[in-house]
Structure formats: structure tokens, C-alpha cells
């Protein structure tokens, strides 16, 4: 008897599109803030919007910049440092792809929850 191999369909609930770089809570907040402000945000404004410390924001921005998702422009204004962060076109595209997958997760979860809810008529029958 010959060994038959079946093609295995991709795992339905693998959600490979949930980009690990974006999925981290702080980085998701950063990208969401930046996508809502296409001209960019100053470091301190972004820090307040995301409720992060200087160090946390710096580290997460570094990860996002290395991945090509954000661009950081540093300059001086009246002898004070000015850092402006913007989402890149690549960052915008990956963020939107991430949202598509996240929306599928929500749809799947809602469908699973709805199918798991007991039918009120059946519950009454069992209780009687």
C-alpha cells in the first residue's frame, strides 16, 4: 500500500498576520497614534498619548524604526532638541494588514461566542 500524503490546509486560527512587532501593546499604541497624526508627533506628545516613560518610548521607537515602520527626525528649535516621529509608508501598509488580521480574530471570536451561548428555549426545557 502506497503512503498517501494529504495536503494540510493552513491552520484556521494561526493568525500569522498578527505581526509581533506591532502586536506588543505599547508599539500598537504608538503606531495607532502616529497613523492618526500623518504629519507626525513630537516625542513628548507621543509619550503622553501612549502613557509611556521616556525610556520605554525610546526603546519601542527604536524597534519600530529598525523595522522600517517609523521615521524619527531629530533637530533643534530655539536651542532645544526636537524629535518628531512619523509612520512610514511601509509602516502604514503593515499596520493596515495587521488590522485586517485583527478584525478576523474579532469576527472569529464573536462567532465562537455566539455559537457557545445556550438557546434560551432549550435552557427552559432542561430546567423544567
What are the residue ranges of the model-derived segments?
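Short, charged, low-hydrophobicity "junction" segments
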Residues: 1-5, 40-43
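Amphipathic alpha-helical dimerization/coiled-coil segments
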Residues: 2-9, 13, 32, 93-128
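N-terminal helix-turn-helix DNA-binding core of bacterial DNA-binding proteins
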Residues: 13-56, 77-78, 84-86, 93
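Acidic/proline-rich low-complexity IDRs
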Residues: 17, 51, 56, 68, ...
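Residues within the DNA-recognition helix of helix-turn-helix
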Residues: 60
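Charged, amphipathic alpha-helical coiled-coil/dimerization segments
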Residues: 63-114
Amino acid at each position: 500500500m502506497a503512503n498517501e500524503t494529504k495536503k494540510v490546509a493552513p491552520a484556521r486560527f494561526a493568525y500569522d498576520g498578527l505581526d509581533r512587532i506591532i502586536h506588543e501593546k505599547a508599539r500598537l499604541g504608538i503606531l495607532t497614534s502616529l497613523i492618526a497624526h500623518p504629519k507626525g508627533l513630537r516625542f513628548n506628545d507621543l509619550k503622553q498619548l501612549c502613557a509611556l516613560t521616556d525610556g520605554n518610548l525610546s526603546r519601542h521607537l527604536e524597534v519600530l524604526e529598525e523595522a522600517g515602520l517609523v521615521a524619527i527626525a531629530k533637530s533643534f528649535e530655539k536651542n532645544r532638541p526636537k524629535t518628531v516621529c512619523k509612520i512610514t509608508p511601509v509602516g502604514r501598509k503593515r499596520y493596515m494588514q495587521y488590522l485586517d488580521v485583527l478584525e478576523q480574530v474579532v469576527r472569529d471570536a464573536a462567532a465562537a461566542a455566539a455559537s457557545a451561548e445556550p438557546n434560551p428555549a432549550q435552557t427552559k426545557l432542561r430546567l423544567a
